[in-house]
Amino acid sequence: MASSNLIKQLQERGLIAQVTDEEALAERLAQGPIALYCGFDPTADSLHLGHLVPLLCLKRFQLSGHKPVALVGGATGLIGDPSFKATERKLNTSETVGEWVEKIRRQVSPFLDFDCGKNSAIAANNYDWFGNMNVLDFLRDIGKHFSVNQMISKEAVKQRLNRDDVGISFTEFSYNLLQGYDFASLNKQHDVELQIGGSDQWGNITSGIDLTRRMNQKQVYGLTVPLITKSDGTKFGKTEGGAIWLDASKTSPYKFYQFWINTADADVYRFLKFFTFMSLENIDALEEEDKNSGKAPRAQYVLAEDVTRMVHGEAGLEAARRITQSLFSGALQDMTQDDFAQLAQDGMPIIELENSADLQQALVSAELVPSRGQARTMISSNAVTINGEKQANPEYIFSASDRLFDRYTLLRRGKKHYCLICWKA
């Protein structure tokens, strides 16, 4: 992605929501590499899919020769960003936030290159400059540059200010000053000239631009990526089970892969532009191929494989593929113990049973049927499989050979209704 027309290429991919002084930024990028940053607050012990677009945007800039700074908010995470939030955030302990900072730092690292010469990435933590700052310095050196009149007019906090039942605390109200100072501090330390973030960060970004101009007498820029929505208007990155996390212990690679496989046709080519590094020409060619093939589209598989590989590595992708293929074919011999652990984590409904359980009881406990009578009917009609093998004996009692890895049994009714039995020790 050539640096000289990077802004234009990001726009063509639909990756720019707002940008300050677009013409001046494009000119600055044409002059040579810049340093830019994106902040990630530790509001949980993992990033989620909503963080992926700005994180990949950092990577796009680095691939074009620019120097990315990944800022983890060890200080701002203690305060909480009120932007477009209906209620006050719960304040977490400094110990908890410190642990989350390290987890998120490790999570961000594989996406960027920290050893590639002049544009090697930098990892930063804003606790480094806020941790020892006293309140008088904060008010005198930072607070004096902020107009309360302007702060209360920002869209990000307006809804809270207009509500009598919730309001906004001074703690959260001060967040805007903290993030603004991040920009000024990074500009001074690393000559950072651009901040990128989600579209909900526009107010915080413009505050940082103004503060940097006042404190450092430097012109800097801001760019936001759009809030990703699905074509049906629902939130992207959420399932009935909650958020899709980047941490494999919170969302398994299998579930992560399946999330992308289930992308709607109306969204998939747009998501390829947002979440992969495929060229626009190749995405357009894939869309044309899918339209004319008369078969199920390939795009979802391309998307799922690219993003799963990027987040979980080749081993994570292979496991997700292996589980998917095994469940589709009913042949479980290729599945590993770790694969079954992924299914038990979040891949399908699970139940725990005693070793003496029979098949009828298992079907009822798994809520695959409402009653033992219905279970008998289903079993007798060859609609039930155990570990991929049909079982037609309604009086069947599980044996040791049914317990894969001495722990798991996969139960299926019909073609799509699964349950994983985890046998009690």
From Swiss-Prot:
Protein's UniProt keywords contain Ligase: yes
Keywords from the named record: Aminoacyl-tRNA synthetase, ATP-binding, Cytoplasm, Ligase, Nucleotide-binding, Protein biosynthesis, RNA-binding
Subcellular location(s) per record: Cytoplasm
Residues holding ATP: K238
Domain of life (superkingdom): Bacteria
UniProt KW RNA-binding keyword: yes
Similarity remark: Belongs to the class-I aminoacyl-tRNA synthetase family. TyrS type 1 subfamily.
Name this protein carries in UniProt: Tyrosine--tRNA ligase
Origin species: Pectobacterium atrosepticum (strain SCRI 1043 / ATCC BAA-672)
Gene (name only): tyrS
